[in-house]
Amino acid sequence: MHDTFKGYVAPWECDEMGHMNIQFFADKFSQSLLRHLFFLGENSKGTPGTLRALHMRFHKELHASDLAAAHGEVSAFEKENGVLTHFMRNEENGALAATASFHLPLEKMPDEVTPLASEAAPRGLTPGLLFRPGMEAHEGLTETNLSAVRGHECSAEGGLSLKGYFSRLSDCQGHMWRLAGLGRQEQKARGLATATVELHFQFFGALGEDDLIAVHTGLDAVGSKTLHYRHIFFNGKTGAPVAAADGIGLLFDKETRRAIALPEAVHESAAYHRL
């Protein structure tokens, strides 16, 4: 186990939900991964161009002025492929905030492999529910993001950073909830907010400076309190899919911070955008 990150939640990293936005979890975890790879003697920088997948679970919110700390461990290694799992905690009370399991090639045999902790293991997003090649052509998808990669969003290696992907995912969420029948303004009027509790990102290609991005979104399943959404990232110049994110989202009451049942309008609207 290696201590790999220690930082602070700045007020500007928090959104209208009252907690740290998902893109800043991604940013802090990517810094944590970079230090872990250094400790392991790896040359990889762990950028999306080298990552195969990333699985995240969110357990407790982090708020402005909270202290965040992370450590990493090797959860699997086989035939030069590894899984590095990172745990981020609120350093004030020790509560586990989130986990991130990075699937990537490793050049060296690690000294120690620790079985994947239950807190980091897939829960709602089992392998059979995830995006598979060919699904990008599904008619149920709706365009939720059109953007371009700016230079400041890229790593030293030239590709769009993990935070850059998650920044767009965060933007897409507002459009996704509107598709689901409960847009941001109505949420605000009703004292509601949204959160992602589990996320699985897959990477198939790289995006560089000035590349165009298009994201298409659909809903795969809706339960009593959660919905399964999918964002597919395309290279806007070639039309090729470069990444896909499957997530489990929920609604919560902003006052009690507790999850609530999805309104009937969500079930009705989601039926028109289901994958």
Regions found by a protein language model. Name each.
Residues H2, G49, A95, H138-G140, ...:
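A generic structural signal for short, non-catalytic loop/turn and secondary-structure boundary residues
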Residues L51, G72-V74, T196, L219:
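A structural signal for short, hydrophobic beta-strand segments that form beta-sheets
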Residues H152-D246, L250:
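Structured core of small recognition/catalytic domains
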Residues K45-R52, E80, L96-A97, A195:
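A short glycine/small-residue-enriched secondary-structure motif
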Residues Y8-C14, R52, M56, A148, ...:
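A generic, residue-level signal for flexible/boundary positions that often mark functional hotspots
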Residues D3-F5, R57-L67, V74-A137, F203, ...:
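HotDog/MaoC-like acyl-thioester-processing domains
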